[in-house]
Amino acid sequence: MQGKFTEQDTEAFYDSEDAVYRSFWDDQGSLHWGFFDDTTGTDFLKACARLNELMVEKAGIGNDARILDLGCGNGTTAMWLGNSCGCRVVGIDLSGTRIGNAQQALLDQPAELQTRLGFEKASATELPFPDGSFTHVWSQATIYHVHEKKSALREAHRVLENGGILVFDDLTKPRPDISDAARTYVYDRLLFDTPYSFETYQGALKHTGFSILEAVDLSTHLKASYECLAKIAGAKGDEHDGKYGELSYAYDQMVRAVDKGELGWGLYLCQK
């Protein structure tokens, strides 16, 4: 599916909004949602860290892994993976601003880690790597932004070695009929649309050649994430010319969209 938004729109969005999101989402530059359990309570950043841990556990990532981080943003998770797992990671992102941030942040890491990590500007639909380059493809809060999703899934499959693992989360559209509010504050605001529900996404993955090892509907965790973010942004007041108030309202609308079945979130573990 190719939507009305372009990769250039997405690149411009994240180039311009990075500082705002850092100021209340995560000052280290991470930008994804969280998995809430007894260990996290209602702490949003703990829930984000728990999602990272859960994905590592499910994907079986060890120090021999060669990981492609698809949509790496500011490189925060890639550096966490390298530090925590001792693996090699290459991160790609459309945003030149965020890739520059990642490359700069890497210079502050130990020299040994710098030899195992790298970041480059690239599109998920045209990956600059040979076939079978990676043991794992990892992605968080990214593929919904890719306007040719089938191409991105094919490219992820291509660069994985035989038996390699794709582990990722993505937004889904549980039903095709959505309200004007959901269109405005969810889909148009985030410059995306998707043909996939939680179930039909699995069909697309199978059609690409993946075996589905596990699929988990995380929509309740998406709702909890935006409930937290609405409060955090709202508490910022009128800083950034009222941007926080706008975001807090939009996040409340996203909570409502999840409640109404107009927005979902899934985690997928697949094997080539």
Predicted regions and their residues:
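N-terminal auxiliary segments of SAM/dcSAM-dependent transferases
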Residues: 1-23
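Conserved alpha-helix/loop element of class I SAM-dependent methyltransferases that forms part
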Residues: 27-37, 42-63
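Short, glycine-/aromatic-enriched active-site segment of Class I SAM-dependent methyltransferases
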Residues: 171-192
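Class I SAM-dependent methyltransferase SAM/SAH-binding core
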Residues: 66-70, 74-126
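Short alpha-helix
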Residues: 193-209
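A short acidic, Gly/Pro-enriched loop at the edge of an enzyme's catalytic core
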Residues: 125-136
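A short glycine-rich, Lys/Arg-flanked "PGG" loop and its adjoining helix->strand segment in the class I
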Residues: 150-165
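Conserved Class I S-adenosyl-L-methionine
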Residues: 214-272
